[in-house]
Curated annotation (Swiss-Prot):
This is Glutamate--tRNA ligase. Monomer. The gene is gltX. Gene3D superfamilies: 1.10.10.350, HUPs. The lineage of its organism: Bacteria, Pseudomonadati, Pseudomonadota, Gammaproteobacteria, Pasteurellales. GO terms for biological process: glutamyl-tRNA aminoacylation. It comes from Haemophilus influenzae (strain ATCC 51907 / DSM 11121 / KW20 / Rd).
Length: 480
């Protein structure tokens, strides 16, 4: 049989990996980690990375899921050299190989009815035998190829399949455990396990990195690869990701979709850094640049044990990257969250200034956008607890006095604003907090914000003065 590569197979490329998700749902964190490990291994070895969409499940695959997967890969910045390739567009190729296998006696048509197969399974279960096809049709010459049938791969019956898993070591499966796999359905569509084999062959895949739930597929795929004379890639089956309670990761542990983490305010760098450490390590190092990941990553350092997802650790990493990445870069991601929350940022400080002001205070960009609304739009009410605590005593007098001094400023800058607040406190013979806290609630609506001088510069003179007057009126109304 001949190779039919969908792209030019550069003979100088010694490592070619692939990420091959099924578009039946979003890109979840387990799939994202698999994609990352596969991508890193290719980059570490100056190789190529292929994106393949395994959409043979026609009933469950959707264009929306495909778009979500590609969006997730792009957001994580895991670019591919080849693809995306779609299995549904390669059915002619798969059927060509199947027909050749039938001609060469490597596969055969099976005309058994569903009733016959159920009866066979029932008998085997009663006899406490492993359910498997009995090759009833292997030498059948009484049916026409035009009659309804499936095609089965003629699996070897002797010996074992042995492969050295790059993560788990030597794995051996007896061929007596394997059935004659259906490789083409009655409707003429090829099955998943077969399509994978042909694709890995045609695309020159040298290393298959995937979840441990695929281990049972591997011996079947190896036998087909051997039958058609294709090279056997190196397999690496990575462990599953559990929640922090040891149970399989699910929605009850929080977000499981990659794009949900984007929506929740995480930077892609934080999620990538977290995922790479979720089953792989390099000494005690926790923070990795993209370049360091590529330089250090090896499959034999990937853990065989399941990993536990810890949201607090992810938040810690996210805050690190919010602080350490250039404000211009963080601001681009922050802008999405303002739009998502319906906040118009056209009338207010530059988003880079917001990042600089709030980087130490916020764990997520969603929190940063939500907690900085007052820079761009008016708030409806004062926080009840903050107003009750700080709009009492001589708060109205302090606000009136500081408003007077702020109004008189010739320059609206940090130093001048700080001096105005300081002078107000001195003249009233009170601590800075007796002026600063009522002022904070007056201009932000809450008791939390960056330092007052920074906050007031960001909000702008006209808004600040109007909000102080509003607070004074509010206090008088409350005391009336």
């Amino acid at each position: 049989m001949k190779l039919d590569a969908p792209f030019n197979l550069d003979p100088n490329v010694k490592v070619r990996t692939r990420f091959a998700p099924s578009p039946t749902g979003y890109l979840h964190v387990g799939g994202a980690r698999t994609a990352l490990y596969s991508w890193l291994y290719a980059k570490h070895n100056n190789g190529e990375f292929v994106l393949r969409i395994e959409d043979t499940d026609l009933e469950r695959s959707t264009p929306e899921a495909t778009a979500a997967i590609i969006e997730g890969m792009e957001w994580l910045n895991l670019p591919w050299e080849h693809g995306p390739y779609y299995q549904t567009k390669r059915f002619d190729r798969y059927n060509q190989v199947i027909d050749e296998m039938i001609e060469q006696g490597l596969a055969y048509r099976c005309y058994c009815t569903k009733e016959h197969l159920e009866e066979l399974r029932h008998t085997q279960e009663q006899n406490k035998e492993k359910p498997r096809y009995d090759r009833h049709c292997l030498h059948d010459h009484n049916h026409s190829p035009d009659e309804p049938h499936v095609v089965r791969f003629k699996n070897p019956t002797e010996g074992s399949v042995v492969f050295d898993d790059a993560v788990r070591g030597r794995i051996e499966i007896s061929n007596s455990e394997l059935d004659d796999l259906i490789i083409r359905r009655t409707d003429g569509s090829p099955t998943y396990n077969f399509c994978v084999v042909v694709d890995d062959w045609d695309m020159g895949i040298t290393h298959v990195v995937r979840g441990e739930d695929h281990i049972n597929n591997t011996p079947r795929q190896i036998n087909i690869l051997k039958a058609i004379g294709a090279p056997i890639p190196t397999y690496a089956h990575v462990s599953m990701i559990n929640g922090d309670d040891g149970q399989k990761l699910s929605k009850r542990h929080g977000a499981v979709s990659v794009m949900q983490y984007r929506d929740d305010g995480y930077l892609p760098e934080a999620l990538i850094n977290y995922l790479v450490r979720l089953g792989w390590g390099h000494g005690d190092q926790e923070i990795f640049s993209r370049e360091e990941m590529i330089n250090y990553f090896e499959l034999d350092h990937v853990s065989k044990s399941a990993s536990a997802f810890n949201t607090e650790k992810l938040q810690w990493l996210n805050q690190h990257y919010i602080r350490e990445l250039p404000p211009e870069y963080v601001a681009k991601h922050l802008e999405w969250h303002y739009k998502d929350q319906g906040i118009d940022t056209s009338n207010g400080p530059a988003l880079t200034e917001i990042v600089t002001m709030l980087a130490e205070r916020c764990k997520t960009l969603k929190e940063m956008a939500r907690s900085s609304r007052y820079f761009f739009e008016e708030f409806e009410t004062f926080d009840e607890a903050a107003a009750k605590k700080h709009f009492k005593g001589n708060a109205a007098e302090a606000l009136a006095k500081v408003k007077e001094k702020l109004t008189a400023l010739s320059s609206w800058d940090l130093h001048s604003i700080h001096e105005a607040i300081e002078q107000t406190a001195a003249e009233l013979e009170v601590g800075m907090g007796k002026v600063g806290m009522p002022l904070r609630v007056a201009v932000t609506g809450s008791g939390q914000s960056p330092s007052m001088d920074v906050t007031l510069v960001g909000i702008g003179r006209d808004r600040v003065l109007a909000r102080i007057q509003r607070a004074i009126d509010f206090i008088h109304a409350q005391n009336a």
